[in-house]
Structures are given as C-alpha cells and as structure tokens.
Amino acid sequence: MIDTVLFDMGGTLEDIRVDDESRRSSIQGVLDILHAHGVDLHADFEAVARSINAGWDRYGAYRDPRQRELKPEEIWGSYVLADFGLDEEAVRPYAEELAHMWEITHYHRALRPRVREMLEGLKGMGMKLGVISNT
C-alpha cells in the first residue's frame, strides 16, 4: 500500500521563471557579493553579465548530459566566474552566498495551480509527503 508521496520542487510543485529584472538583479547581486569580499572584476556591467551567462551555459553543457549537479564552489569557480580568473579555491569562502543569492534573486518561484489543495488532500488521506530537490 502506498503511504508516501515524494515530489520534485521546481517544475512540479512550483513554476519557475526568469525576467529581465531578475537577470539584472542577480548579476548585481554577484557584483555586490564579490565587492563585499574585496573582489573587483574590472569589467563593466554588460561585460560581466555576458561572461556570467556564458559561464552558466558552459555549466549547463557539463551538467545536462551527466545529470549531475556540482558543489557551489565548483559551479562558480570552474564555470560561472572562470572568465575572471577566479577558481574554486578563490570562490570557496563565498560560493554558498553566491548560490543562495542566485536562487532567490534570479528565479521567480510560485506554486503551480491547485498544488496546495492537492497536498492538503493527500495529507487528509494520511499520506506522508516529501520534497526532493537539488536547490
């Protein structure tokens, strides 16, 4: 008898979208965190944005065929900020901070329609509920 239901978060329980404002805010967030840690990328905002976006594309090209997420210091040091000469060791002290900021700034998240009612219904049936996510 089934007594437990597990869900993925993104795309299953919630919708995720990105818009121009969240893109700009997340790039500014990266610059703010780096500045707070004494790091200056010596590039204008648009150049930084292009490099960071290219870094995310490189990470996606690595991750997607392998279906394997890396640690924040690997993502930011080997892919996202690699164009600026920052490696895993350089970003390790603030990699989690960058990852957290990116997740809450770059993405708009909202529960999908009727998710709350579905979860309440399952709970009312005595089901145990769980969420599995990589974020």
Question: What residue spans do the PLM features occupy?
Answer:
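Active-site neighborhood of HAD-like aspartate-dependent phosphohydrolases
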Residues: 1-50
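Glycine-centered loop/turn motif at secondary-structure junctions
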Residues: 38, 85, 123-126
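A short, structure-level motif marking secondary-structure boundaries and short turns
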Residues: 15-16, 61-63, 102-105
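Substrate-recognition element of Asp-dependent hydrolases with the DxDx(T/V) motif
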Residues: 94-135
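Soluble or luminal CAZymes and related metallo-dependent hydrolases
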Residues: 22, 26, 71-72, 107-114
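A metal-dependent, Asp-based hydrolase signature
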Residues: 45-99
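Residues within well-ordered alpha helices
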Residues: 33, 79-80, 121
